[in-house]
């Protein structure tokens, strides 16, 4: 038995995972069903939210094409089924000497305390708190833009998008002369990485759905969507061929693609560029760049980089503490011989969860830890319901229906990691059956 003995009371090794995103939740599930089930370790997952939704789906939540309440996963229920514990809380400090993390209280909208401030003991800590948007200090970005870092922000955008659309619809109905007016709604998305590109395509799809549901006074052509990128092409981390293919598809949809445009400042209705140009914008989304949360900077004396990410060794242990690991977007790992860190992508978090399941077993048994090796399986970008572009293992470029099927399969693989093949098959069947009965767009 691998339990530690304190007096006559046995205590198993306590693994605390902070952050229930794609990587953290998959790791907790794997460890719960291996170490937790066999009582070798006590596995605890901590998150500031009660539910999980796969982050790459947030652009669909924001557009209303995905109802977040139907695809969310409750942490308490999932923990109960998978042999780990879930604590509601938000970490703000680590006490390395006492091996405690400190949680701040969680307060409801009505001012009531949902979770008190407290400390949680750990033997091994895994930090998996993900990332937040990086506004680079741009004037007006925090106050005027919506970010898409979590479900609540995506839900907020969806409500504002729907409200803006309905208000414009009402104005047209009140004043017939407004029917000739173009660009009644101006949406600006700052940042043409994966999130920005996917959101732009999904919003244009949503505009067509509004018309199908009878809101015909505002045609899709009257909704101007501008995708703004500071570099010379969209999707700059992908190949030029994939970038060009995605741009052509976006332009076919009627989306304005603005490249080499650096945002200087943002106010309530206008975005100003450094070259003196400006564009109107009723609704603004900031999707340019990421960083780890600010509180992580130099936390507990650990090494962090300029993006607040915890610097880790090839074992994913932090550089200054063997008992603290980091994974996903909040970790910076530069493989030997590489010039830059591995990218902040869902497939990285998935591979790290698989790696850490074994590595943490070795860690508990005080064995030599393996080295994490990232295997890039390619990237896929969704261009709404029926199209995707990207490249797969070996650099093969794909697009169209085949790419779309592969894109959807990424989410299904995440579900398999959490629920297993049988339950995922049931979820797929449920989604197929409900497609014929539920609206294709959230209208509330």
Give the ranges of each region predicted by the language model.
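Beta1-alpha1 glycine-rich phosphate/pyrophosphate-binding loop at the start
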Residues: 2-88, 92-93, 194-237, 285
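FAD-binding core/adjacent interface of flavoenzyme oxidoreductases
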Residues: 2-12, 84-186, 285
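C-terminal, flexible cofactor-proximal segment of oxidoreductases
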Residues: 10, 352-444
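Conserved N-terminal Rossmann-fold NAD(P)-binding element of oxidoreductases
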Residues: 18-19, 127, 190-191
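Short glycine-rich anion-binding loops that position phosphate/pyrophosphate groups of nucleotides
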Residues: 23, 130-133, 200, 290-292
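A Rossmann-like FAD-binding core segment of flavoenzymes
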Residues: 82, 86-105, 204-314, 318-320
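FAD-site-proximal beta/loop scaffold in flavoenzymes
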Residues: 144-175, 269, 278-351
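Rossmann-like dinucleotide-binding core of oxidoreductases
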Residues: 177-238, 245, 256-258, 343-360, ...
